[in-house]
Amino acid sequence: MSLEPKIPLPNSLQKPLSRFYEYLRSEKGLSLHTQRNYKQQLETMAAHLVTLGLKDWSQVDAAWVRQLASKGMREGMKASSIATRLSSLRSFFDFLVLRGEMTANPAKGVSAPRKQRPLPKNLDVDEVGQLLDVNEDDPLSIRDRAMMEVMYGAGLRLAELVGINLKDVLGRQGEIRVIGKGDKERKAPFSGLAKEWVDKWLKVRGALASPGETALFVSKLGTRISHRSVQKRMEEWGKKQSVASHISPHKLRHSFATHVLESSQNLRAVQELLGHENISTTQVYTHLDFQHLAQAYDQAHPRARKKNKD
């Protein structure tokens, strides 16, 4: 959507705008800069109305305002810019309602998209391979590789990884039972390499675990490993394996999502695998059955196939 309207506005659209500009100048006392911003935003939207065949502001409804916000998102506008555009519309329609030219403000209930936090830069497949190429045979190294393989193989959150109990490893099915946000349980697939290293870890876990400890991954003290310990160990392995990027549990999860999405182009499957209720602020949760998820996972995940058996 261009910043300046290229289409002449009919009087039915232009005159209410002119009255509003005068109101901003004489009664609101806004600066020239702010007035120009209002003018730019509103006349751009008025030109868009003309392209849709609308000739009067009273024809605008909430659906049109939402479509306008969505259009801005599709065109790559920043969330803050869309919020400014909606704010201009709300102020203008409040003015028209006050003057009796409209009965209600159609922009009143339309929210601007939330400003999203930037996602961390993901590791590429080669960097993941470099990080996970841990072949030391002491119990802590085996544990650490198993943790990283599971986190990347299933796209788990840090809390989900730490919360896994022995009973949650469903080896025959190639699944791990995890408790996600809101205490919601789901079964996550994990790759052949992740399963291979979990099996190796289980063989040496007894050397560290305290009697009766139910956690899959334990610390040197024999109890469930802490969030901070996982973060610290991953950072250390990133440096030891000479991976250029800073390593964090969330970066592994983000890398999982990016790699599977790039391979499968199946956004809904990735949504389900990650345990997300909402795929974005504009998309609702779509459930896929586990068989379809597992199939998409097996075909797409770069470490999903175990090496040829001996």
From Swiss-Prot:
Keywords: Cell cycle, Cell division, Chromosome partition, Cytoplasm, DNA integration, DNA recombination, DNA-binding. PROSITE patterns: CB (PS51900), TYR_RECOMBINASE (PS51898). Belongs to the 'phage' integrase family. XerC subfamily. It is found in: Cytoplasm. GO terms for biological process: cell division; chromosome segregation; DNA transposition. Forms a cyclic heterotetrameric complex composed of two molecules of XerC and two molecules of XerD. Coiled coil: none annotated. Residues 118-298 form the Tyr recombinase domain. Residues 11-97 form the Core-binding (CB) domain. Site-specific tyrosine recombinase, which acts by catalyzing the cutting and rejoining of the recombining DNA molecules. The XerC-XerD complex is essential to convert dimers of the bacterial chromosome into monomers to permit their segregation at cell division. It also contributes to the segregational stability of plasmids. Gene3D superfamilies: 1.10.150.130, Intergrase catalytic core. One of its GO terms (molecular function) is DNA binding. The keyword Mitochondrion does not apply. GO terms for cellular component: cytoplasm. This is Tyrosine recombinase XerC. The active site is at R157, K181, H250, R253, H276, Y285. Its main location: cytoplasm. It comes from Vibrio atlanticus (strain LGP32). It holds the Pfam family Phage_integrase.
